[in-house]
Structure formats: structure tokens, C-alpha cells
Amino acid sequence: MDSRDRPIGFFDSGVGGLSVLKHAIAELPNEDFLFYGDCANVPYGEKTPEEVRSLTMSCCDLLYKKGAKALLIACNTATSAAIHAMREKYQMPVVSMEPAVKPANLSKKPGKILVMATPGTIASSR
């Protein structure tokens, strides 16, 4: 199957990533999308990194098997626990939302930045 005909896979530990998907649909109207929200195992924040990695890989394996040409991880906890393993395993782009925090933190604009994160994300070296 030509990659232009394959969907972009979205993964989140729940349904919060639907807001990200909504923006992607608006920005990329000619793309197809698959969304997997792991509501059966939410919340991920208090799980061990190994549990989060296993759950994330399982969910993303399904998106991969369904033909996803790229994966967007909308869960920062999943990103911190599994992004390296995912990039090693899948021969496609794997991106996440988490890098947006870094430029905001480095911004020269005065003011405060609020970061809401789970214990698993805060404990991560990312």
C-alpha cells in the first residue's frame, strides 16, 4: 500500500489526545487517521515505566498492524517511558507532544509557565 493511502496513528492513554487529533484533522484534511485511547488502563501516571512501556508498545503495535504510516504519541507519560523503544522498533516517524515544553521553558518572555505532569513524566530524564 502506498504510504499516501495509509493513516497516521494517534495514541493516548485516554481521550485527551482527541483534542490534538481534532487540530491534525483541520491542518491535514487530506490525511486519514486512526486513534487509540487506552481507556481500559488509564491513568498511566502512577504505573511503573515498565508497565507504561508495555502498554504503550501493545497499543502502538495495533496501530502499526492497521497500517499507520506514522505515530503521534499524545501522552507525555507514554513518551517518557517508551519513545526510544518505539523509534527503534518501528520503521516510521514516531513523534510526541512532549518536546513543546522545552522551547517554552527556554523562552525569553517574562512570566511563568505551568507544566502539568504525572509522577512518571516528572521522574523521567526527558
Where are these regions (language model features)?
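Non-catalytic structural scaffold of enzyme domains
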Residues: 1-126
